[in-house]
């Protein structure tokens, strides 16, 4: 009986560990289930891709996960069309079109894609080296990876590590993941294959 119970417990532990190490999709390719729109900018699905596009108000817009995420690895692909000024926010909250949190930048060439910016706070916390910014394929599909664990954040672009930051304030942050469309109009960004693995 004891051996049977021990075997069952071991199976449960193995199953739990395996589940915690799995990537899951944040975007189903059909609609915006699991997400919430903030602002009047356009967020829609086209041919299995998530589209962010400037609206008539030309203001900031955000698409946030309804679920908060603390420690995780996030992978995604993005393609910048027109002015591709955007970003991925971590441990963030949004009220109206004002976001509180930290952004992993997505921008046109030589404007610090992969760097980390604190909105309505300290501003740029870290920028990538100029030579590393050459990893951006503007107008093409790019692969981004973001790891957030405790007070550490690391970003990669097309396999190239862009920045690594340790920050106590980020470590205390709480909130969800948000995609941004920048104010000013004329912006369009495509997203696909948004996947996340939660870390303990």
Identify the role of each PLM range.
Residues 4-14:
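Sec-dependent N-terminal signal peptides
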Residues 19-200:
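Carbohydrate-interacting regions of secretory-pathway proteins
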């Amino acid at each position: 009986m004891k051996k049977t119970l021990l075997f069952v417990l071991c199976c449960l532990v193995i199953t739990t560990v395996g589940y915690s190490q799995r990537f899951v999709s944040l975007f189903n390719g059909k609609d915006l289930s699991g997400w919430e729109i903030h602002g009047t900018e356009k967020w829609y699905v086209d041919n299995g891709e998530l589209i962010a596009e400037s609206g008539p108000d030309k203001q900031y817009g955000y698409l946030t996960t309804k679920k908060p995420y603390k420690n995780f690895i996030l992978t995604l692909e993005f393609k910048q069309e027109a002015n591709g000024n955007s970003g991925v926010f971590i441990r963030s909250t949004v009220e109206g079109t004002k976001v509180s949190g930290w952004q992993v930048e997505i921008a046109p060439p030589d404007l610090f894609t992969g760097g980390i910016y604190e909105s309505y706070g300290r501003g740029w916390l870290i920028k990538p080296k100029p030579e590393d910014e050459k990893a951006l394929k503007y107008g093409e599909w790019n692969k981004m990876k973001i790891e957030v664990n405790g007070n550490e954040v690391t970003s990669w672009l097309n396999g190239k590590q862009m920045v690594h930051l340790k920050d106590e304030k980020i470590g205390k942050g709480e909130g969800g993941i948000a995609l941004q469309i920048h104010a000013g109009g004329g912006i369009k960004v495509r997203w696909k294959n948004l996947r996340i693995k939660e870390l303990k």
